[in-house]
Amino acid sequence: MVPDLAELKDSQWSAEFETLMRNRLIMGAFRYGMIKVQKKRAKEGGKRYDVVRAVAEKVRLYEETGNTEHIVDAANYCLLVFELDPHPNKHFSAHDDAGGHCQIVK
């Protein structure tokens, strides 16, 4: 039986993870400015951060240490890539299940 939408919404997210993400994003606003200000600054040719590289580095650090702080940071950097990255071919194109997902390792 397929769960109803409310159950899926409740089970397919982590409130703790979201809280950790939001808390760190709020602290980041003090350090680096609010996301909408960073977006404006980037469009005007101002200072930008290499957030794509930061995602990979945070995942590497998590794999090395097991510290989930790095995964929270990687998730926030992914959000910043979505919002701020100036990739010239940036777009969203949904794909089906054909080969683009995690593989079973155990």
Question: What are the roles of these predicted feature ranges?
Answer:
Residues 1-106:
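Flexible "arm" and connector segments at domain edges
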